[in-house]
Amino acid sequence: MLQPSRRKYRKEQKGRNTGLATRGAQVSFGEFGLKATGRGRLTARQIEAARRAINRHIKRGGRIWIRIFPDKPISQKPAEVRMGNGKGNPEYWVAEIQPGKVLYEMEGVSEELAREAFRLAAAKLPISTTFVARHIGA
């Protein structure tokens, strides 16, 4: 699964996920993309599950790019532990997603196959998404 190899600090504050995606909002590498229309967090497991769904559907047909990376640690305290005594340990990694962000890209397959593969991938994700095609000349 995806996670950073090294970080300067182990834990991070929660923060707020606001605004729209300005970077990574266009299909840059492939012909088709899966773009987020909702906002939220994608865990490394969800990103991997969607990637597997895409790969399984297109078989050996095309090429896939994952445009997001889970670089934010989420800490959790163990079950049945009293409040206080510091922050919990990092449990998993997430990518903060803003509306407009392209999550996955694909090339080398037909549009119908890409649409179906992205539909299967979107079912694995907790945010709303839409299918986008690359604008030639843009």
Curated annotation (Swiss-Prot):
InterPro entries xrefs: Ribosomal_uL16, Ribosomal_uL16_bact-type, Ribosomal_uL16_CS, Ribosomal_uL16_dom, Ribosomal_uL16_sf
Region (Disordered): 1-20
Composition bias, Basic residues: 1-13
Gene Ontology cellular-component terms listed: cytosolic large ribosomal subunit
Keywords: Ribonucleoprotein, Ribosomal protein, RNA-binding, rRNA-binding, tRNA-binding
UniProt entry tagged with the keyword Transport: no
GO BP: translation
GO molecular function: rRNA binding; structural constituent of ribosome; tRNA binding
Subunit field text: Part of the 50S ribosomal subunit.
Family: Belongs to the universal ribosomal protein uL16 family.
Primary role: Binds 23S rRNA and is also seen to make contacts with the A and possibly P site tRNAs.
Protein name from the UniProt record: Large ribosomal subunit protein uL16
Organism per entry: Bordetella avium (strain 197N)
